[in-house]
Each structure stands twice: as structure tokens, then as C-alpha cells.
């Protein structure tokens, strides 16, 4: 048990008889979506569960065992010189940031609740911009508790601008639905309509895209926001 604890960042990743099967299937969904884009699809979505963005290379945490978005980005790198991971889960993706913090081939940008009094607490601050070769390839835009639709959407637009400025050739969207005001873990005040608008905004980005599902803990909210996001995203991607 002590050895297992060395590779666990918190108490949120219990391991049972079926854990590995679920974790592996979730990661393989991300692999399949990324392979579809590598082979020529303009977009693909991985309905991952459990989520992944709190998982480090060698550590589970925050309900996450394998980092699905990072795995997808690795697959995309077989075709694209630089990939951007853009994360709008209400929690900062500390695992994703750590994996790519010293690298310039994957840009990571995150919009999330200010971590000063919110999980993951020790990462997600605006002054974390990357290190060494990865300097300026990490962007954190923390939002104060109670933040609503307009600042949330504006911050996502800033992520997109930064990813394009970094010359990303493909995008992984870490799509967390838990910023919704009805989510039991949310401290933000984001509405269902904001996710609809986000779908349109991300759909306008002229890059091959993999959507990887992250968090979301209100089934009622997910039933509203995920279809709205995906529908608007796909509508924008249709040839005019």
C-alpha cells in the first residue's frame, strides 16, 4: 500500500477490480479519436470516463489515472509539428501542465477556477508560463469564484488566440462540463448557453480538433451542455 501511495496525489483515485479496464478504455477512446484526425478527419470526440487532466506521467490524482488529453496530443504529434491543448474544465489540469511544462511542441492553455482556495491548489496560477524550452508555451487564466458567462467565454477566446499565435497545427480540447452553475463541484456561475456559444467559438478555429471529455458531475447539466457544445461546434465546421 505504501508503494501505491507514492504514485497517488490524493485520496480521489481508489483502485478496485475494474479500475484498470475502465481507465484503459477511456485512454483508448482518446487514442482512437486522435488517430482519426491523424488519418484525415477534421474533428473527432472521445467520450472519456474517467477523466484525465489531473494525471501526471507517474501519478494519479483528482479522479484521473491516465492523462487522456496528453495521450491524444502525443498521437497527434505523429503528424503535426505543434499541438495545443485547450482546457475549460472548472479545475486546472495540473497533470497536463506538468507533462508539457518543459516542452515547446505542445502548448497548454487553461481556463479554470482560481486555485488559491480550490483544487488542485498548488498549480494553475497565471505566473506559470512554462520552463526552459517550454517557456511561453503554458497559459493559465484563473477565474474568481462566481464568474459568469462573459468572462468565461472571453478567457476561452484568449486561449484560442494564444494557441494560434504559438503556431499550433492541431487542437485537443479538454472539455470539462463542471464549470456549470448546477455542478456540485463548481464555484463558477456558467450557464448552459455559454457552452453553446463555446461550441461555436471552438468550431470556428480552422484546425483539426480532438475533443476529449474531462470532468462534469451533474448528469442533468451534462445532458444539456454537452449536446449544445457539440451541435454548435459541428454546425460551424460544416462547409459553407
Language-model features and meaning:
Residues 1-28, 40-42:
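A contiguous, low-structure linker/loop signature
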Residues 31, 35, 46-201, 230-234:
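Conserved alpha-helical scaffold segments that buttress catalytic/binding sites
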Residues 183-186, 219-224:
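Metal-dependent catalytic neighborhoods of phosphoester/phosphodiester hydrolases
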Amino acid at each position: 500500500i505504501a508503494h501505491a501511495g507514492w504514485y497517488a496525489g490524493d485520496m480521489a483515485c481508489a483502485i478496485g477490480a475494474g479500475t484498470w479496464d475502465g481507465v484503459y478504455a477511456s485512454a483508448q477512446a482518446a487514442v482512437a479519436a486522435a488517430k482519426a484526425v491523424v488519418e484525415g478527419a477534421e474533428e473527432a470526440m472521445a467520450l472519456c470516463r474517467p477523466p484525465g487532466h489531473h494525471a501526471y506521467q507517474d501519478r494519479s490524482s483528482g479522479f484521473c489515472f491516465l492523462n487522456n488529453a496528453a495521450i491524444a496530443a502525443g498521437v497527434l504529434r505523429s503528424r503535426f509539428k505543434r499541438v495545443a491543448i485547450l482546457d475549460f474544465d472548472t479545475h486546472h489540469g495540473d497533470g497536463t501542465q506538468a507533462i508539457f511544462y518543459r516542452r515547446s511542441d505542445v502548448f497548454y492553455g487553461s481556463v479554470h477556477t482560481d486555485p488559491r482556495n480550490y483544487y488542485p491548489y498548488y498549480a494553475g496560477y497565471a505566473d506559470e508560463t512554462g520552463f526552459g524550452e517550454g517557456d511561453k508555451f503554458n497559459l493559465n487564466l484563473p477565474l474568481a469564484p462566481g464568474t459568469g458567462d462573459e468572462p468565461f467565454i472571453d478567457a476561452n477566446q484568449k486561449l484560442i488566440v494564444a494557441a494560434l499565435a504559438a503556431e499550433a497545427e492541431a487542437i485537443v480540447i479538454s472539455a470539462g462540463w463542471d464549470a456549470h452553475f448546477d455542478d456540485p463541484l463548481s464555484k463558477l456561475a456558467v450557464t448552459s448557453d455559454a457552452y453553446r456559444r463555446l461550441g461555436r467559438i471552438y468550431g470556428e478555429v480552422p484546425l483539426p480538433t480532438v475533443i476529449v471529455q474531462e470532468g462534469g458531475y451533474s448528469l442533468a447539466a451534462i445532458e444539456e451542455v454537452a449536446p449544445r457544445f457539440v451541435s454548435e461546434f459541428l454546425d460551424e465546421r460544416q462547409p459553407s
